[in-house]
Amino acid sequence: DENNQEIVGTTSNCRSVNVCRQVAYNNAITTYASLAASYVKGRTASDVNLNSSDKDDTAEFDKFYAAYERVIGSEIKNGVLKESYSIKRKKGDINEYQIVFFVNEDKALLARKKAMQRALEESQLAQKYANEISKFVNEGVENINQ
């Protein structure tokens, strides 16, 4: 499907396949959340014209980025990731595991919007920069995981 992106979760050095699967799943979520937050941080820095000498704004943006990354990680657990396939490799009595997920971009966009709203509410930025940040979150993201 052209509206899906691929994201990979990996882990190694685990003995239980169930533990491997869970760690790989969590790693995929962490990777996606980190990439989404990096995208927002980059766009914010360039589009909002953040003045790095304004320590109050910088601190609030740091809180916002952390909250956004945390919330997007919890939001994408709700049906955004769909497992495509997994690969297990055994090395002695430990396993390496990799799961490839499809990220449904329609659902991911809704998750990012919800995460953005919650992160803005947690920071003081809602009144000052909400329109600019909302604009590029609503634009969607092409190839966020590349």
PLM regions and their residue ranges:
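Domain-level marker for long, solvent-exposed, non-transmembrane regions
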Residues: 1-146
